[in-house]
């Protein structure tokens, strides 16, 4: 079998960042998959599931309710490697196109207080696995490393 595109990226040179992982055509619509890389692969510890899970719930809620972007949100969720999230949006987009959206998302998570949306046994299959403080830690780190000063090496995969 042919190696899939995401396995051809040199993870040894990869930094935290906002990367276009792939673009797919669905009829007349382009779907852009973003790799929101929160930790440096194989160097930093992977994210703990409770923090990831909290970002997933808050992120999905924020993005699917965003006045400008909600109709373009296809998917937001973590990857199994626990170093990143995937964000799939309708549109032929670049990493630079979504910096503002991700800054708003970061501010939402960092300012969030109270019960996390969807955390009940009725609404979530693993509702006890959450940690808002850890989610804020990861988001603060991502904002500082990537969003506050988005350089080219954090917006485009290394060659």
Describe each region flagged by the PLM.
Residues 1-63:
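His/Glu-rich zincin catalytic helix
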Residues 144-159:
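Histidine-acidic residue clusters that define the catalytic metal-binding segment
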Residues 75-148:
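Active-site-adjacent, His/Asp/Glu-enriched structural segments that form or flank metal-binding
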């Amino acid at each position: 079998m042919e190696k899939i595109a995401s396995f051809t990226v040199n993870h040894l040179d990869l930094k935290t960042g906002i990367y276009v992982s792939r673009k797919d055509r669905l009829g007349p619509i382009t779907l852009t998959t973003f790799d929101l890389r929160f930790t440096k692969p194989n160097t930093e510890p992977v994210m703990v599931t409770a923090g990831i899970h909290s970002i997933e719930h808050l992120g999905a809620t924020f993005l699917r309710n965003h006045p400008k972007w909600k109709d373009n949100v296809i998917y937001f969720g973590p990857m199994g490697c626990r170093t990143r999230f995937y964000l799939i949006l309708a549109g032929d987009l670049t990493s630079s196109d979504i910096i503002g959206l991700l800054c708003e998302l970061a501010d939402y998570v960092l300012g969030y207080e109270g019960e996390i949306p969807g955390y009940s046994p009725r609404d979530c299959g693993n509702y006890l696995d959450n940690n808002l403080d850890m989610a804020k830690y990861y988001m603060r780190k991502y904002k500082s490393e990537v969003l506050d000063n988005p350089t080219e090496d954090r917006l485009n995969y290394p060659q």
